[in-house]
């Protein structure tokens, strides 16, 4: 993301200074690993190649640039709730073994174990559910075009529910994990609101705010993903 994309005040000394590169282009940012307190990995990934590579690149660089007397780096890996599988009647938590992940996310469950099991970093895994809020969600891209056209078209099933978390609350979870990295290293955290949201309610609210004439549901084009984002009432 280019620097101009980050909103900030001219007198704000805490503005984020981005390094524009692919995450695996570690030569652009490996010098920072000698002194930073934490790495928060939020890179999107639909497969293990880049996600696993970034982690192992960081581990390799740490061995050469970080003093042996320095405190361990905290590495926070973003995974997802899909690793819990697609059960409609089992209750899961942070500590539930991921023995039956959804096939789409099976690789994530394996990678999680590498991160939390590392002896070279304080490895922490954060599993957000569907992220909402401003530009931090796919929800707008999915629903707004149809609302603009006059009728909201939703993804899922009538009466279904979404487990969501606002991006500000997710950011707070990252902050708390980093602040307590030396204590909670080796831990995994599911990040979700206490209550799920009814999809019908979300679509009805969008209709009211946009002036669209009602809502409907469309048949999913990728049934491998639909179980990951919806649950029956």
Regions found by a protein language model. Name each.
Residues 59-106:
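Conserved Rossmann-fold NAD(P)-dependent oxidoreductase catalytic core, especially the SDR/UDP-sugar
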Residues 163-170:
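A conserved structural motif in NAD(P)-dependent oxidoreductases
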Residues 173-232:
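Mid/C-terminal beta-alpha module of Rossmann-like enzyme folds, strongest
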Residues 121-125, 129-162:
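NAD(P)-dependent short-chain dehydrogenase/reductase
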């Amino acid at each position: 993301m280019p620097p101009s994309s980050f909103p900030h005040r001219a007198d704000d000394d805490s503005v984020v200074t981005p390094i524009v590169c692919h995450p695996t282009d570690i030569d652009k940012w490996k010098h920072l690993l000698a002194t930073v307190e934490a790495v928060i990995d939020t890179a999107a990934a639909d497969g293990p190649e880049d996600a696993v590579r970034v982690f192992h690149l960081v581990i390799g660089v740490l061995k050469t640039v970080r003093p042996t007397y320095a405190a361990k780096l905290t590495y926070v890996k973003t995974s997802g709730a899909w690793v819990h599988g697609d059960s409609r009647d089992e209750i899961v938590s942070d500590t539930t073994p991921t023995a039956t992940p959804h096939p789409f996310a099976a690789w994530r469950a394996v990678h999680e174990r590498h991160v939390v099991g590392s002896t070279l970093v304080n490895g922490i895994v954060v599993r957000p559910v569907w992220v909402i809020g401003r530009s931090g969600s796919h929800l707008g891209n999915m629903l707004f075009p149809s609302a603009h056209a006059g009728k909201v078209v939703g993804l899922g099933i009538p009466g279904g529910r979404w487990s969501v978390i606002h991006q500000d609350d997710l950011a707070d979870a990252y902050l708390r994990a980093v602040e307590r990295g030396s204590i909670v290293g080796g831990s995994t955290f599911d990040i979700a609101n206490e209550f799920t949201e009814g999809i019908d309610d979300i679509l009805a609210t969008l209709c009211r705010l946009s002036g669209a004439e009602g809502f409907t549901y469309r048949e999913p084009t990728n049934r491998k993903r639909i179980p990951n984002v919806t649950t029956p009432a």
